[in-house]
Amino acid sequence: MRVADFDYPLPEERIAKYPPLQRGSTRLLVICREGGTVSHARYRELDTFLRKGDLLVLNNTRVVKARLMAEKSTGAAIELMLLEKHGQEQSLVLFRGRVKQGDRLRSHGHEFLVEEIVDHGVARLSLPEGRSIQPVFEAHAEVPIPPYLRRPAEPVDRERYQTVFAEHAGSVAAPTASLNMTPELLLRLRDGGVETSSITLHVGLGTFLPIRVDSMEEHVMHREFYSIPAATIEKIRATKASGGRIIALGTTVTRALEHAALSLSGHSGPGPLEGEADIFIYPGCSFRLIDALLTNFHAPRSTVLMLTAAFAGPDLLRRAYREALDKEYRFLSYGDSTLIL
């Protein structure tokens, strides 16, 4: 299947550059796979589409401060995005600007050495004497809002580019389907008999790297660590046994659950089920665990768009996106959402 089949025109004015004034006040496009219908609602009305016995699974990862400005010896500005640790003394970063192996980059009194160019726009950095890079980012970096917002991080992003249930630090991007969720809506869902439970998946490099091949089958996904607590596994089993639905709040939850699906049945004991999700879900793939998906509107040619198309069906999703653009929905991280039933 061709990557180009998942391109579409996204006008700049349809990209939400800032969060809504009030969390949860966004719109919700509802896609019904069985009837092939598209309808319109508000995110705060999510509880009217779920029912007693359903299980809503959340990703409780917390976004870390990961965006740091540095400069070369020439004075040229370089933007660094911390992606992950590479051993104990080196880290992978996504960079914007001209950088080569051996360059030295200065920021806030520290000098990083570019050890290696790993991929297009990805480098491995170190500090002198084997010191860890993480404390420098923790002290001086900003919230890593997406580059397509075309603006620096602002105070509003510190709160709003984080979910209300963020707990375990480790992501370099938010699980954006959850940004519109509010404590009040979660309470209404629970009062209506909808169970909730959490997993942790730390969003990493794969979120930022574009697909550079023509055929989906050739694309290799980056690994992302996940942890599914034993309590969540038990809730999933109980929900399935009673005929309830597993509602994935976002593509990160979907990837973690679908990657772990074959291991869940045999997992026992008090400890979590942990792994590294490296599956690329695109049309033609089957889903073993999730029954519904709440997610955002995704960028053209992105892996998360392809995952969403795999779940909704490519033709139905294209029709839904066209309708959303016609009705001026807000797209991408700070935008509106879709519920696929």
From Swiss-Prot:
Its main location: cytoplasm. The gene is queA. GO terms for biological process: queuosine biosynthetic process; tRNA wobble guanine modification. It comes from Chlorobium luteolum (strain DSM 273 / BCRC 81028 / 2530). It holds the Pfam family Queuosine_synth. This is S-adenosylmethionine:tRNA ribosyltransferase-isomerase. One of its GO terms (cellular component) is cytoplasm. NCBIfam families: PRK00147.1, queA. Monomer.
